[in-house]
Design a protein with these regions (language model features):
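Short beta-strand edge/turn micro-motifs at domain boundaries
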Residues: 123-174
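Alpha-helical segment of the N-proximal tetratricopeptide repeat
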Residues: 180-210, 214, 221-231, 258, ...
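Canonical positions in the second alpha-helix
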Residues: 210-211, 244-245, 278-282, 313-314, ...
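Alpha-helical adaptor scaffolds
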Residues: 223-231, 253-270, 274-316, 323, ...
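Terminal, low-structured helical/coil segments at or just beyond the last alpha-helical repeat
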Residues: 355-384
């Protein structure tokens, strides 16, 4: 008994000694990325660029590919030279008041992931989950990231790009990580990638049906078909590609943002709401922007009570997100909860130091009953 107690006390002492180190590791990952995000919001990309481990990203991109050495070297040099432009592709000029937000950091020893949300203006929101490691000198480096707007990692996008740049029977081997095909199937895949490179969409759609069945049904091919649908600007092909992606991989939360516009275009608000809930669960954090999108999906599906609850929650989580206030106002107006609508409008004015003029509501038909309500009249009278 005494020995067991002694062992327990020893373990507890050891744990208490380790805790400061564990907490310091957690804080340093989080502190580093908080600093990067602060700099991005001030217009500086230098800290982000400094943290990028391009060599590690390229090793992942090239892993398993049989590339011509000259092609490999030229492609790598182009990526390295364009290092400063990488961040510019997702940190763009956005509306006044928009910002990048660090949503969470998950630490596992000397590795971690950091989830960032980018405001892309009219396009909506982009999410990147960064994979972080600590190098031999203790510096925190970015070695890859999952881009939720593309449904794949940055290294996988580079992998596809380098093979598209020089599509040969040798280079396409290893392109699809989960696929091991025959010589003939790789020859067809090389022809297909040549058509992508040359933007020869007629040849692409002639070759694609003849591919090996396992390859045709892979996530890689579904994503490639979506890419080609966008590149060709063929609306029918685009819809077919996204319909197939939804039917076969629609429950994959990493594809929720990719599928969002397609689901919106066909008015599939219930499925959109479900995929956004899956996305929220995958994030491991309640994100106000996703709640806002869920609120809009619920409103589209005529689940107005849910829309109001979700928009109100978005405001409580992140008061700086102005769009959430309008989503809440619209939902409460539809529910004829005019006191809640006025209360939300007042909160919006206070948070953003602005005055909502009468004309803003009175010129829109959606607020016709709201502007006739006693609650609205009292609010306007108090403003005069």
């Amino acid at each position: 008994m005494i020995r067991d107690k002694f062992r327990s006390l020893l373990l507890l002492s050891l744990l208490l000694c380790l805790m400061p180190g564990i907490m310091a590791a957690n804080q340093s990952f989080e502190a580093r990325f908080e600093s990067i995000v602060d700099q991005l919001n001030q217009g500086s990309k230098e800290e982000f660029i400094e943290a990028l481990d391009i060599d590690a990203i390229l090793r992942r991109a090239f892993d398993g590919l049989d590339l011509d050495p000259a092609v490999r070297s030229r492609f790598a040099n182009n990526v390295i030279r364009g290092k400063k432009n990488i961040v510019s592709s997702f940190v763009r000029r956005t509306p006044e008041g928009s910002y990048t937000k660090l949503l969470n950091v998950r630490v596992n020893g000397d590795k971690a992931t950091a989830l960032l949300r980018y405001d892309l203006g009219r396009i909506g929101y982009g999410y990147h989950q960064y994979e972080l490691v600590r190098d031999d000198e203790g510096n925190i480096r970015i070695v890859d990231w999952l881009d939720y707007t593309a449904g794949r990692t940055y290294s996988d996008m580079l992998r596809q790009s380098v093979v598209t740049y020089d599509p040969t029977e040798s280079s396409v081997r290893g392109l699809v990580k989960s696929y091991d095909g025959s010589d003939e199937s790789y020859a067809r895949l090389a022809e297909l990638m040549q058509a992508v490179r040359d933007k020869d969409f007629n040849s692409y759609h002639r070759i694609e049906p003849s591919l090996d069945r396992r390859l045709k049904h892979s996530l890689f091919m579904h994503l490639l078909n979506c890419d080609v649908g966008k590149m060709s600007r063929d609306q029918n092909r685009y819809n077919d590609a996204y319909r197939a992606l939804e039917n076969n991989f629609g429950d994959n939360p990493a594809l929720a943002l990719m599928l969002m516009n397609y689901r919106l275009s066909k008015g599939d608000f219930d499925d959109l709401g479900q995929s956004l809930r899956q996305l929220q669960q995958a994030f491991g954090v309640r994100d106000a922007a996703v709640l806002l999108l869920m609120s809009r999906a619920a409103l589209g599906a005529r689940h107005t009570d849910d829309a109001a609850v979700l928009a109100d929650e978005a405001i409580s989580i992140e008061p700086q997100l102005e769009s959430s206030y309008w989503a809440a106002i619209n939902a409460h107006v539809l529910l004829q909860h005019y006191s809640f609508a006025v209360s939300t409008a007042r909160s919006l004015e206070d948070q953003f130091d602005k005055s909502l003029e009468r004309e803003l509501f009175e010129k829109s038909g959606r607020y016709a009953n709201f502007v006739k309500s006693p609650q609205y009249e009292q609010w306007q009278a108090e403003k005069e």
